[in-house]
UniProtKB/Swiss-Prot annotation:
It comes from Haemophilus influenzae (strain ATCC 51907 / DSM 11121 / KW20 / Rd). This is Putative uncharacterized protein HI_1485 in Mu-like prophage FluMu region. InterPro entries: ANR_neg_reg.
């Protein structure tokens, strides 16, 4: 007979996309765009199609912000 372990529930309900998206958002707010870009890349691996599109756009934004001053401007 299997018994459920109390800590197993948190592992089963772990949302990898949300975890990395929240980390990315915090890094963006702190101005750490290179780190945020990495977190968005990780978030994309577990994202739904809608969330993947959002993560791609945020990652692209972070790439551009990291390249400041902007070339050609």
């Amino acid at each position: 007979m299997k018994t459920k372990r109390p800590h197993a529930k948190s592992v089963e309900n772990f949302n990898r996309y949300r975890f990395y998206a929240e980390k990315a958002a915090k890094e963006e707010q702190a101005g750490n765009y290179e780190e945020a870009e990495t977190h968005w890349d990780l978030a994309m691996l577990s994202a739904s199609p809608e969330n993947k599109e959002w993560a791609i756009r945020r990652r692209d934004f972070c790439q551009r912000m990291h390249q400041r001053p902007f070339e050609g401007e």
